[in-house]
């Protein structure tokens, strides 16, 4: 019987953003996005979960060091202490909601991870998170 095991790695980054549509006036942006229609920041937590069979030689699904390297290279270096609307090329033209950032993170990570990506969870605050699942 084959058993599939999932492992999750967490990383953190701090970033600023604004939720707005430039073609809308301030009143409409405030109605839709509330206080988030003004520049503000978050201390984000991202959880990356991969899945696979446990390697009989190493006892691991994937080496966490390798997963850390991918997360750092593909996400943290691009996002940490940046303004998501202005500074991050892969978010250009996208409203950087938690949902959109989580989806973009999935697209960045998936081709580089050493095991099958099954979940990306972006925690924006203690009350807000977005999750992309396979």
Where are these regions (language model features)?
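Charge-rich, low-complexity N-terminal segments
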Residues: 1-134
């Amino acid at each position: 019987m084959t058993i599939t095991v999932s492992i999750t790695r967490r990383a953190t980054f701090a970033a600023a953003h604004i939720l707005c549509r430039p073609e809308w006036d301030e009143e409409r942006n405030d109605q839709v996005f509330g206080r988030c229609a003004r520049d503000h920041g978050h201390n984000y937590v991202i959880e990356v979960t991969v899945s696979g069979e446990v390697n009989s030689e190493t006892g691991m699904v994937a080496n966490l060091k390798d997963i850390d390297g991918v997360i750092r290279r593909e996400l943290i270096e691009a996002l940490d202490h940046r303004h998501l609307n202005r500074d991050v090329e892969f978010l250009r033209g996208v409203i950087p909601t938690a949902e959109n950032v989580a989806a973009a993170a999935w697209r960045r990570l998936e081709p580089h991870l050493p095991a099958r990506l099954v979940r990306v969870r972006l925690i924006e605050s203690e009350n807000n998170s977005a999750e992309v699942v396979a």
